[in-house]
Amino acid sequence: ASFEHIPVLLNECLDGLNIDPAGTYLDGTAGGAGHSRQIALRLDGAKGGRLVSLDQDPDAVQTARARLAGLPATVVQINFRYAGQALESLGIEKINGALLDLGVSSHQLDDAARGFSYRADAPLDMRMSQQGETAADLVNTASREEISRILRDYGEEPYAWQIAGHIVEARETAPIETTLQLADIVASAMPPEERRKNCLLYTSPSPRD
């Protein structure tokens, strides 16, 4: 699936990077290569200018490689937390600037098969890299305490303990396998007034365009 990524603050990002045509730059979140392509277009490969663009999502990597073809850019499939490792493997000791556009992309939300959105019923996946444990694995095996901690620490969810309890109770009847199944369980754990007030909040994560 091809990423469509229109950078919202492109000019501001480029101004902030103050690109040197002979410099080395890192884009830690390639996505659809919207930022990466514009950075690479401003680099002069003949003078040593180079972009290293990272993403853990194989769809994003495939798209970025196609859109950066012929430019002084290298695309690596890896999480940006391992940027140092990626740069070292390419023999790069220092960079002139880095860009991180963090969040879930609109492409990932719009692709129901990825399991990030509750707009359509789909397998409960939610993996950025499409490797390792799925969200379904987590909600069907983790303890109430662990699920509550994740919701509280990463989602700042005030009803984390109640939601975790409903998840554990529901999975005793049948495995939780789809996005809408989980959404219904989450909604059932909310007080009626909160459910009405936050009906939109609990139907979709915030997208990164």
Predicted feature residues:
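S-adenosyl-L-methionine-dependent methyltransferase catalytic core, i.e., the SAM/SAH-binding region
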Residues: 1-204, 208
